[in-house]
Amino acid sequence: MRLLLDTHVLLWALDDPARLGRKTRSLIERSEALVSVASLWEISIKAGLGKLKIEPRHVFDAIEPSGFDLLPVQATHALEVFSLGAVHGDPFDRLLVAQAMSERITLLTFDQALLGYGPS
């Protein structure tokens, strides 16, 4: 199974894995876990605004050793955003949903607002 980790799932997996719960941690360990470059962009912006107390470079440096692979943002992902309804206004989340749909990957999130897009 391929999973695209939502940004908060990535941060919890790296900094506070217990917050994910045993079943979610096990699912991540048994799957090909992907991290979108868009998540790094989101973390960098929010850290720069003081909304996150984290060094974006540390997150980037922890991705590969944690067994996660990076998913680049492709033009097809950006275009897929157009097809999404207005369920969620956050541009980072919308891009993650579009990537999951385009790549036929399950988006792993605890964000209830994203569930309005249905299974990805």
Model feature map: region roles:
Residues 55-60, 65-115:
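Active-site neighborhoods of divalent-metal-dependent phosphate/nucleic-acid chemistry enzymes
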Residues 1-35, 49-61, 103, 112-116:
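Short, well-structured N-terminal submotif of metal-dependent ribonuclease cores
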Residues 118-120:
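Active-site regions of enzymes building and remodeling cell-envelope glycoconjugates
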Residues 43:
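Phosphate/NTP-binding elements of NTP-utilizing enzymes
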